[in-house]
Structure formats: structure tokens, C-alpha cells
């Protein structure tokens, strides 16, 4: 399985069944420290708050950190709790597993490396918030949220 190279990216919300939906879309957007990460269009005033640094760690997991201008301290994809539909928070960066979606080169499922009996915990969108979604580990459960990583 190909791994994502370290670098700066914009993260567009897509799905495993439709990894290339065409023009437009919503992108992971920081609102501020300790605030939920939003899904917003890639237009002003959101555009400058959609740049993320992805760094792969020695254990094969990755951190996704906000790379915007004038950030007073380091924050990235994080969580207070990993419950169904709990928001992704811009906080102390946590580690995630990035799983390449088959038949794509730049679309990944973002999975929290947390052991839950029978489920994978994945980053998706509900309304305009990034949230944690639970899916059966056996691959059932239908279409899954995924993210197109576009290099900056």
C-alpha cells in the first residue's frame, strides 16, 4: 500500500465510492485552537485556513497539523473523545492511520488508531463539521468518508 509523502496539503472531503466528484467541494478548515475543524469551500475567507502539514512518524502513523500563517502554537487534527459523531478538534495533534483508497493515488481514509471492538473510527463530515464515524471492521457499512490530499 502506498503511503502519503510528508508535505503540505489541502484535504477535500470525498467518499470511497466517488473519490473524484469534480469541481467544488468542501475542505478541512481550521477555525481556531480548541475549535471543531470545519468543512468549507475553497474560497475566501476559508482558503488560507485549509493548509495542513502531514508528517509520517516512525510507527507509520501520521499527524495532520495546521500550517497556516501566524499560528501562535502548533495544533492539528485531535479529539477530546472518540464517540460516534464527536467533532475533530484543532488541538494537540494526534496520530492517524492514512489508508489509500484502492484505484486512487491521492485519496485516503483517515482512521484514528484506537482499538474499538468491531469498528474502525474514521474522519468524515456531518453538516459542515469534521466528525468521527464508526464503521464495521469487516468492510461492510457502505460508502465511507475519504479525503483527497492535494499538494500545495
Curated annotation (Swiss-Prot):
Domain of life: Eukaryota
Keywords: Protease inhibitor, Thiol protease inhibitor
GO MF entries: cysteine-type endopeptidase inhibitor activity
Positions in coiled-coil regions: none
Role: Binds and inhibits cysteine proteinases. Inhibits most strongly papain and cathepsin L, more weakly bromelain and cathepsin B while it is completely ineffective against cathepsin H.
Subunit-level organization: Homodimer.
Protein family: Belongs to the protease inhibitor I48 family.
Name this polypeptide is given: Clitocypin-5
Taxonomic classification: Eukaryota, Fungi, Dikarya, Basidiomycota, Agaricomycotina
Amino acid at each position: 500500500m502506498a503511503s502519503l509523502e510528508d508535505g503540505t496539503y489541502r484535504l477535500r472531503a470525498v467518499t470511497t465510492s466517488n473519490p473524484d466528484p469534480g469541481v467544488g467541494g468542501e475542505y478541512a478548515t481550521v477555525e481556531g485552537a480548541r475549535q471543531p475543524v470545519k468543512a468549507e469551500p475553497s474560497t475566501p475567507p476559508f482558503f488560507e485556513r485549509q493548509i495542513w502539514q502531514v508528517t509520517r512518524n516512525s510507527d507509520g502513523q501520521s499527524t495532520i497539523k495546521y500550517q497556516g500563517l501566524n499560528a501562535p502554537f502548533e495544533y492539528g487534527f485531535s479529539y477530546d473523545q472518540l464517540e460516534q459523531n464527536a467533532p475533530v478538534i484543532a488541538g494537540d495533534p494526534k496520530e492517524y492511520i492514512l489508508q489509500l483508497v484502492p484505484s486512487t493515488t491521492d485519496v485516503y481514509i483517515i482512521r484514528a488508531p484506537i482499538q474499538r471492538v468491531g469498528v474502525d473510527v474514521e474522519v468524515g463530515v456531518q453538516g459542515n463539521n469534521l466528525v468521527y464515524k464508526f464503521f464495521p471492521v469487516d468492510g461492510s457499512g457502505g460508502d465511507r468518508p475519504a479525503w483527497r490530499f492535494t499538494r500545495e
